[in-house]
Each structure stands twice: as C-alpha cells, then as structure tokens.
Amino acid sequence: VLCVQGSCPLLVVEQIGQRPLWAQSLELPGPAMQPLPTGAFPEEVTEETPVQSENEPKVLDPEGDLLCIAKTFSYLRESGWYWGSITASEARQHLQKMPEGTFLVRDSTHPSYLFTLSVKTTRGPTNVRIEYADSSFRLDSNCLSRPRILAFPDVVSLVQHYVASCTADTRSDSPDPAPTPALPVSKPDAPGDPVLPIPVATAVHLKLVQPFVRRSSARSLQHLCRLVINRLVTDVDCLPLPRRMADYLRQYPFQL
C-alpha cells in the first residue's frame, strides 16, 4: 500500500504485468490504427450501444442516501473505534505512540466529506478521506484512479475489506507476496491547509492492522462474543439461536 502526499492525489498500483498511471501517461503515441474494411468479419453482427450523455443529470435518491448514512453511523457507533468529531491534531496525538497499522475513523473537518480514516504509518499518523457518492463509500482518490477504487455500502465494510487484504498479505508465505491494496494519498483534512509535494520515491506504505478503540466506548462482553461469532460463522441464520440473539448478531455483521 503506497500513500503519497501532494496537491493532487496519486494512486500507485503495483501488480505483475500492470504499469502505474504515471508511466502510461509518458508513453509516446503509436501509429494511428487503420479501420478494418467493411465485411472483414461477416459472421459477426455488431449492435449499436446507446451512448449516455455525460451531461445527463443523475437521478438523486435523498431517502436512500439518508438510510445509507444512518446505517453507517449506527455501525460506527457499535464498532467502538469511531472517534466522532476529533481533529487531525488530536488523532495524531492518539496514534503517535501506537504500533504501525493502528487506525481509527473520525468525522472529517472538510465540508465536502463525512469521514476520515486516520492510520499510524512508518512515517507517523496519516489521514485519508472517505468520500460518499451514489449510496456508497470509497477511499478518496483522483479522477483517473477512481474507477479502480472499490466502493462499499458502509464505512465498516470498507475498513474491514482493507484490513483483511493487509492481513492476507502479511500471512503469505510466498517469497514474493502480492502487493497490498493501493490506498489513495493523504490530503489535508481542512480546506486551506498547506500541502508539501512529496516525490513518489518517498511514498509511505499504508496498512490497516488493528482498530484503536476509545476508552469511553469500551466494548461489552456481548459485543466481543459477537465479533468472535462473526469471524467463525459466515451465515448467522444457519445457527440454532433464539430470534432475539440472532437479531443482535445481525445488528453488527462485522469482524472488527
């Protein structure tokens, strides 16, 4: 996972056989492609696909957005590692002495974002905004890398996905383990904060390992048991449990 600070976010994806975006942008244009003559493939029948206009306004669903955000807040409050409206400086103080990979979720101080993911890295605490659009949450990125970033129905699902990915890479016994999922770069959380460009060579490996639980949000024994059950069972409905207990498990179907 590479995290780079700068005025424009840069998403670096390191995969076998795949080149980073900046390398693709430096390629010289090749020879122009000549169109095939008509009837070159008589057995193929092409169908015209209607092209949707980019200027066509998207259909908004305020009720769906409200339900999605309310569900996310409910999950975060149950998690114990949602710190609410603390600032970036306060998050830095909490994570400064924690081991690498410790993270928390807090409210973003930027008016265009709801949440921010604060993570302890090898270079210190780093902040990554979480953007919301079309009833989905994803890590903040620029326009070019946005199609590569996965979207999730809530923030806890997003965090759990990257924690599982980093854990799988850590446990890999292969001599050349696959690169961890690329997370977008850190940005200043408040508008107007100074941005110092950092070259790609000084990129920071950003990994998510364990959440930093608030002391004031000490998780109950019931919740801890629920986490263990969620880690061991994929489908709660298959368990012979009373309805009340099954409903409690469904209220927080996560492992963190």
From Swiss-Prot:
Alphabetized GO MF terms: cytokine receptor binding
SOCS box domain location: 207-255
One Gene Ontology term, aspect cellular component: plasma membrane
UniProt cross-references to Gene3D superfamilies, sorted A to Z: SH2 domain, SOCS box
Annotated keywords: Growth regulation, SH2 domain, Signal transduction inhibitor, Ubl conjugation pathway
Domain SH2: 81-162
Pfam short name (any one): SH2
Pathway annotation from the record: Protein modification; protein ubiquitination
GO biological process: cytokine-mediated signaling pathway; intracellular signal transduction; negative regulation of cytokine-mediated signaling pathway; negative regulation of receptor signaling pathway via JAK-STAT; protein ubiquitination
Region (Disordered): 168-190
Function: SOCS family proteins form part of a classical negative feedback system that regulates cytokine signal transduction. CIS is involved in the negative regulation of cytokines that signal through the JAK-STAT5 pathway such as erythropoietin, prolactin and interleukin 3 (IL3) receptor. Inhibits STAT5 trans-activation by suppressing its tyrosine phosphorylation. May be a substrate recognition component of a SCF-like ECS (Elongin BC-CUL2/5-SOCS-box protein) E3 ubiquitin-protein ligase complex which mediates the ubiquitination and subsequent proteasomal degradation of target proteins.
Assembly mode: Stably associated with the tyrosine-phosphorylated IL3 receptor beta chain and tyrosine-phosphorylated EPO receptor (EPOR).
Entry protein name: Cytokine-inducible SH2-containing protein
UniProt source species: Rattus norvegicus
Upper lineage: Eukaryota, Metazoa, Chordata, Craniata, Vertebrata
Name of the encoding gene: Cish
